[in-house]
């Protein structure tokens, strides 16, 4: 099958292209050329910006694909441009959505594909919801099938590991060296990373399998864990000491570090569990890469490419840890002294 991937060089896009090629598909990747890719031989690379409709139109015309996999659409306008260009050419359009589309906190767990999406949790989520709606409105089972996949926290080779204050790789060195790691709240909210190779398998299913058009799919972890467990398991994977976790209330972190806590605001503070049974049944999705194995793979790649920053590249973590410990010690001491 001829498959056209928009954004095939990102973390997840690379995994999807690799699996598509391994499954015997002919793949064309539209990419800006700003990132060195690690795609298999035989992939046709087209340089260009999908935000320029003339570029996308020409690339689709030349490739004449049967299926498009779109990893880089974030709003309704971009979606409608893609629909106008592709609907008379391709048989199926696979759109990479996100679990961000679900309202937080969810009214109940586990979250299914029919759980409420509004009000949006962020501007990013609102854009993705609008894009989904545009694609579903264009769905035609007889000529332009639309499939939407909603991944959660996807990680893997070539990327880093998330933590309360972001995605900087100095977190890894902090874990290794036993330095303070900031954790929001009491560390018991839930999180669920899923390796990109497992997520990519679901995308291949969305390309290949009949009867999946017009549907959305959660493609999510089956190792849901608390944030305390997350850090403990990263440490165990790296043979590091027990992590020095410093628990700081979410609202305090948001107040003192707004630029570092967007993901905390929108996601990390909530306990959410996702139902992925539809993706398993329809797309052949399977969760096969255990989290600690995936951590070792990620860190090995970063080590090989000399991309693990030293722990002290993130002084904010140390400043926050010291300030919070000092203030709580003073607070407790004040009560003990009766002041």
Where are these regions (language model features)?
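Glycine-rich Rossmann NAD(P)(H)-binding loop
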Residues: 6, 156, 184-189, 217-224, ...
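Substrate-positioning beta->alpha
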Residues: 163-172, 183-207, 215
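Active-site "gating" loop of Rossmann-like NAD(P)-dependent oxidoreductase/epimerase domains
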Residues: 98-122, 137-142, 159
């Amino acid at each position: 099958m001829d498959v056209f991937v928009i954004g095939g060089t990102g973390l997840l896009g690379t995994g999807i292209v690799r699996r598509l090629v391994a499954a015997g598909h002919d793949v064309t990747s539209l990419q800006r050329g700003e990132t060195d890719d690690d795609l298999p031989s035989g992939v046709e690379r087209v340089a260009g910006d999908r935000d320029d409709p003339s570029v996308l139109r020409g690339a689709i015309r030349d490739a004449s694909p049967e299926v498009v996999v779109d990893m880089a659409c974030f709003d309704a306008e971009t979606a409608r441009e893609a629909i106008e260009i592709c609907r008379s050419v391709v048989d199926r359009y696979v759109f990479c959505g996100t679990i961000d589309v679900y309202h937080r906190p969810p009214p109940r767990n586990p979250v299914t594909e029919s759980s409420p999406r509004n009000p949006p949790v962020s501007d990013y989520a609102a854009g993705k919801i609008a894009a989904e709606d545009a694609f579903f409105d264009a769905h035609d089972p007889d000529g332009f099938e639309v499939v939407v996949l909603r991944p959660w926290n996807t990680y893997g080779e070539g990327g880093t590991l998330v933590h309360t204050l972001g995605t900087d790789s100095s977190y890894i060195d902090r874990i290794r060296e036993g330095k303070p790691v900031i954790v929001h709240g009491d560390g018991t909210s839930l999180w669920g990373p899923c390796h990109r190779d497992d997520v990519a398998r679901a995308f291949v299913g969305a390309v290949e399998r009949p009867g999946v058009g017009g549907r959305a799919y959660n493609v999510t972890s089956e190792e849901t864990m608390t944030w305390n467990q997350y850090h403990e398991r990263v440490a165990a994977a790296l043979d590091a000491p027990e992590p020095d976790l410093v628990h700081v209330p979410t609202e305090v972190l948001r107040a003192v570090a707004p630029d570092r806590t967007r993901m905390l605001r929108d996601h990390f503070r909530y306990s959410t569990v996702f139902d992925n049974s539809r993706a398993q049944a329809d797309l052949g999705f399977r969760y096969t890469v255990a989290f600690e194995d995936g951590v070792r793979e990620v860190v090995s790649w970063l080590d090989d490419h000399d991309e693990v920053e030293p722990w002290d590249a993130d002084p904010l973590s140390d400043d926050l840890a010291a300030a919070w410990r000092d203030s709580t010690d003073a607070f407790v001491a004040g009560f003990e002294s009766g002041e």
